[in-house]
């Protein structure tokens, strides 16, 4: 009714200031879904930015999948609305881009479960939200979830930056990924390579 309409008006005016914040929010959902690997891919051209986040978490049933892009649906008990996916969908679509989510629930697909989110943004549109500080988002994810693996790839034209925590883990052995020195190394390396 009236309350829902007012909340929707509030929701549509409060998009995230950077796509990198959406990345952080959605990747956090992957970790909460029990993912051991979350892949984050940003592919840019002069005209478009394509964001793909896929995980091997527990996935969602078809019923839950239909509901997750509704800002009034959430699995959280601490608030009555879930903003991450609905905001990403809205932000992509308001640039004339697209949004797609697919998922396979572990209960139905015990061998190949997980969720994939794909959003395409038109960078030339007036409502385009900039990518922002994606390095900080990736470092924050690793700091908060040192036992989860992340594969981050950012491609712009013919240049590409990749960070695979599985490779770091193999080299570092017992050193935790969220130790200060490792996080500093990751951040400095990504910042240097992100100058594309």
Briefly describe each language-model feature range.
Residues 73-81:
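Glycine-rich ATP-lid/hinge loop adjacent to the conserved G-boxes
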Residues 1-17, 90-196:
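Flexible, glycine-/charge-rich segments associated with ATP-binding catalytic modules
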Residues 55:
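Acidic ATP/Mg2+-coordinating residue in the GHKL
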Residues 43-51:
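Short beta-strand-loop-beta element adjacent to the nucleotide/active-site pocket used for signaling
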Residues 16-42, 91:
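Conserved ATP-binding N-box helix of the HATPase_c
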Residues 60-71:
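Short conserved segment of the HATPase_c
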């Amino acid at each position: 009714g009236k309350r829902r309409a007012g909340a929707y008006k509030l929701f549509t005016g409060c998009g995230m200031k950077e796509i990198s914040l959406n990345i952080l929010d959605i990747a956090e959902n992957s970790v909460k879904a029990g993912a051991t690997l979350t892949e984050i891919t940003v592919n840019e051209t002069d005209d478009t930015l394509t964001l793909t986040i896929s995980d091997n978490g527990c996935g969602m049933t078809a019923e839950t999948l239909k509901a997750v892009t509704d800002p009034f649906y959430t699995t959280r008990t601490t608030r009555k609305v879930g903003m991450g996916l609905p905001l990403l969908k809205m932000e992509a679509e308001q640039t004339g881009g697209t949004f797609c989510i697919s998922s396979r629930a572990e209960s139905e697909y015990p061998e190949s479960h997980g969720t994939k989110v794909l959003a395409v943004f038109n960078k030339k549109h007036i409502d385009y939200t900039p990518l922002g500080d994606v390095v900080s988002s990736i470092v924050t994810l690793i700091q908060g979830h040192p036992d989860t693996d992340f594969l981050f790839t950012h491609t712009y034209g013919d240049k590409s930056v990749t960070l695979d925590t599985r490779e770091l883990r193999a080299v570092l052995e017992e050193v935790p990924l969220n130790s200060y020195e490792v996080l500093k190394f990751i951040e400095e390396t990504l910042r240097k390579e992100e100058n594309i």
